[in-house]
């Protein structure tokens, strides 16, 4: 006979179901409790008075009617043991607590020698708390990963602040009449950008490198070529071609601005003896001997054009009249001045 001291004895009221969620327990810790195990017979006494007796081996090999569960369930969690025994259609539950883990391990060894196997004694509430803690831990890890990814993305795309800027623009136009050139100097155009903070989630921006670093400008909405109807097709003189320099149909020559370092070439009619005129500006005098005048189209293309070439020429001349092309030239001028 093996006898082990018990410091606490807990017993639940008998029930007719295996559900233990609504069962009242009684706890005794007055002392004088002992547990004895002899050939599978478990007995609990208090001051030599027998208060519990169960044959563990008989119940271990029996099943609860209508189920696949054994009539005996042993749960352990140092230094406690919980025993559930279904006998006489009644479920009995009681729990014992040993003075130390040493007494607990000695008693458990005696149970296992009989072929009895213990399960984990974590209650459903403890398992639920464990699962909740695991879920919260996983959620916190996921949130941490998401925050790290967001911070990393924000670090790679820093906020951009555009300060107000003043960009003067000057348009210089020439009009070729009777092989002579007249100069028109309109007032400078002022372009002021308001205070604005543009963050990384703003619409797409054009980027170009200036003297002060990377500068960004919003994309310009150009006129769609497909929106031009057939009724707007141009009617040009077949004997007029455009030169290789930028050209404004409203003015026979167009300058990129007062600070432009490139010459201005006027349109030259075909079969004409008049060569393209080069408009010299004060700022361009230093480049007069460095940059040659580009050849005109009349010097490159043959006098007789094919039908496809004529159609292509007409389309090019027509599109050059559009405001979108002029705006593009102005944008290129501003970009060039900043480079």
Swiss-Prot record:
GO terms for cellular component: linear element; nucleus. It comes from the Eukaryota. InterPro entries: Meiotic_Rec114. Keywords: Meiosis. Pfam families: Meiotic_rec114. GO terms for biological process: homologous chromosome orientation in meiotic metaphase I; reciprocal meiotic recombination. May be involved primarily in the early steps of meiotic recombination. This is Meiotic recombination protein rec7. The lineage of its organism: Eukaryota, Fungi, Dikarya, Ascomycota, Taphrinomycotina. The gene is rec7.
């Amino acid at each position: 006979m093996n006898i082990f001291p018990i410091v606490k004895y807990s017993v639940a009221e008998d029930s007719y179901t295996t559900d233990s969620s609504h069962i009242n327990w009684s706890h005794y810790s007055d002392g004088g409790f002992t547990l004895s195990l002899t050939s599978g017979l478990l007995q609990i006494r208090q001051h030599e008075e027998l208060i519990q007796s169960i044959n563990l081996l008989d119940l271990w090999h029996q099943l609860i009617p209508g189920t696949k569960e054994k009539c005996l369930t042993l749960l352990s969690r140092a230094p406690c043991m919980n025993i559930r025994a279904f006998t006489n259609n009644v479920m009995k539950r009681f729990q014992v607590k040993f003075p130390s883990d040493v007494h607990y391990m000695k008693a458990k060894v005696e149970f296992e020698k009989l072929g009895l196997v213990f399960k984990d004694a974590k209650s459903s509430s403890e398992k639920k708390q464990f699962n909740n803690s695991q879920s919260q831990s996983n959620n916190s890890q996921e949130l941490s990963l998401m925050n790290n990814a967001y911070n990393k993305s924000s670090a790679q795309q820093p906020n951009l602040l555009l300060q107000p800027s003043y960009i003067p623009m000057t348009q210089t136009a020439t009009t070729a009449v009777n092989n002579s050139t007249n100069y028109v100097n309109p007032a400078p155009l002022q372009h002021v950008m308001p205070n604005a903070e543009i963050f990384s989630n703003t619409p797409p921006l054009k980027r170009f490198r200036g003297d002060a670093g990377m500068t960004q400008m919003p994309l310009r909405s150009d006129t769609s070529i497909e929106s031009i109807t057939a009724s707007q097709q141009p009617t040009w003189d077949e004997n007029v071609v455009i030169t290789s320099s930028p050209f404004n149909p409203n003015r026979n020559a167009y300058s990129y601005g007062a600070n432009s370092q490139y010459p201005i070439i006027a349109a030259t009619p075909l079969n004409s003896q008049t060569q393209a005129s080069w408009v010299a500006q004060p700022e361009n005098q230093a480049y007069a001997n460095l940059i040659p005048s580009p050849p005109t189209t009349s010097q490159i293309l043959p006098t007789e054009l094919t039908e496809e070439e004529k159609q292509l020429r007409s389309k090019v001349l027509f599109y050059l009249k559009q405001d979108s092309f002029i705006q593009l030239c102005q944008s290129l001028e501003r970009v060039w001045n900043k480079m």
